Amino acid sequence: MARYTGPKSKIARKFGDPIFGADKVLSKKNYPPGQHGNNRRRKTSEYGLQLREKQKAKYTYGVLEKQFRHLFHRAQRAKGVTGELLIQFLEARLDNVVFRLGIAPTRSAARQLVSHRHITVDGSVVNIPSYSVKPGQVIGVRERSKSLEVIADALTGFNHSKYPWMEWDQSSLSGKLLHMPDRTDIPENIKEQLIVELYSK
C-alpha cells in the first residue's frame, strides 16, 4: 500500500480522532465519511477493531505496512511490554522527533524536511525519515536551512515544554531526545494492545 496523500479530514473522520492534528471538519462531522455516515453504526468485529487500530497507528505516524511490521517484530524481541515498545519505537522515528520538537507543523512536513536534507543528527545530515533516534542524540536544523519559512513558522509560539522527554535549544535550533517517553506521556489515542492481538494471530 502506498502512503496516503488524499484528504486528511476524511481519514480523521474514519477513525473519529484528529490523528493529523486539529481538524475543523472533524469537529463538525465526527462520524465516518460517506452519504450515510452519520446513520451507519454497524457493530464491528473483533478483527475489524484490531485492524482499524493498526491502520490508525500507521496513518498517525505515516508508516507503511512493511516498516510497521518491522517495528512490531523489533518490539516483540525486545524486553518489555510489546505494545508500549511499539509506540516508543514509532515515537523515536526521526520524522516524528522533528515534529515533536516543533521544527515542522506536521509529521508529513517533518518527513519532507528530513528527505530534503534539512535535518542533522549529531551534526551530520540524515535524510532517512525512519532513522531511529537514540536518547542523547542531538537533532538540529542544517545551517543553510535555518531561514526556511516552514521551520520559522512552525517554531513560532511552539511550547517546547510540552513533551518532557525532549529538550530544546532555541539559540542553535537543536533539540535532544533525553529518554524514551513513558506511554502515559504520549498523547496519541491508540489502543496498542489491539495491534498486538492482531499480529499474534
UniProtKB/Swiss-Prot annotation:
<dbReference type="InterPro" id="IPR018079">
    <property type="entry name" value="Ribosomal_uS4_CS"/>
</dbReference>
<dbReference type="InterPro" id="IPR002942">
    <property type="entry name" value="S4_RNA-bd"/>
</dbReference>
<dbReference type="InterPro" id="IPR005709">
    <property type="entry name" value="Ribosomal_uS4_bac-type"/>
</dbReference>
<feature type="domain" description="S4 RNA-binding">
    <location>
        <begin position="92"/>
        <end position="154"/>
    </location>
</feature>
<dbReference type="GO" id="GO:0019843">
    <property type="term" value="F:rRNA binding"/>
</dbReference>
<comment type="function">
    <text>With S5 and S12 plays an important role in translational accuracy.</text>
</comment>
<protein>
    <recommendedName>
        <fullName>Small ribosomal subunit protein uS4</fullName>
    </recommendedName>
</protein>
<dbReference type="Pfam" id="PF01479">
    <property type="entry name" value="S4"/>
</dbReference>
<dbReference type="GO" id="GO:0003735">
    <property type="term" value="F:structural constituent of ribosome"/>
</dbReference>
<keyword id="KW-0689">Ribosomal protein</keyword>
<comment type="similarity">
    <text>Belongs to the universal ribosomal protein uS4 family.</text>
</comment>
<keyword id="KW-0694">RNA-binding</keyword>
<comment type="function">
    <text>One of the primary rRNA binding proteins, it binds directly to 16S rRNA where it nucleates assembly of the body of the 30S subunit.</text>
</comment>
<dbReference type="GO" id="GO:0006412">
    <property type="term" value="P:translation"/>
</dbReference>
<feature type="region of interest" description="Disordered">
    <location>
        <begin position="26"/>
        <end position="47"/>
    </location>
</feature>
<dbReference type="InterPro" id="IPR001912">
    <property type="entry name" value="Ribosomal_uS4_N"/>
</dbReference>
<dbReference type="Pfam" id="PF00163">
    <property type="entry name" value="Ribosomal_S4"/>
</dbReference>
<dbReference type="GO" id="GO:0015935">
    <property type="term" value="C:small ribosomal subunit"/>
</dbReference>
<keyword id="KW-0687">Ribonucleoprotein</keyword>
<dbReference type="GO" id="GO:0042274">
    <property type="term" value="P:ribosomal small subunit biogenesis"/>
</dbReference>
<keyword id="KW-0699">rRNA-binding</keyword>
<comment type="subunit">
    <text>Part of the 30S ribosomal subunit. Contacts protein S5. The interaction surface between S4 and S5 is involved in control of translational fidelity.</text>
</comment>
<dbReference type="InterPro" id="IPR022801">
    <property type="entry name" value="Ribosomal_uS4"/>
</dbReference>
<dbReference type="InterPro" id="IPR036986">
    <property type="entry name" value="S4_RNA-bd_sf"/>
</dbReference>
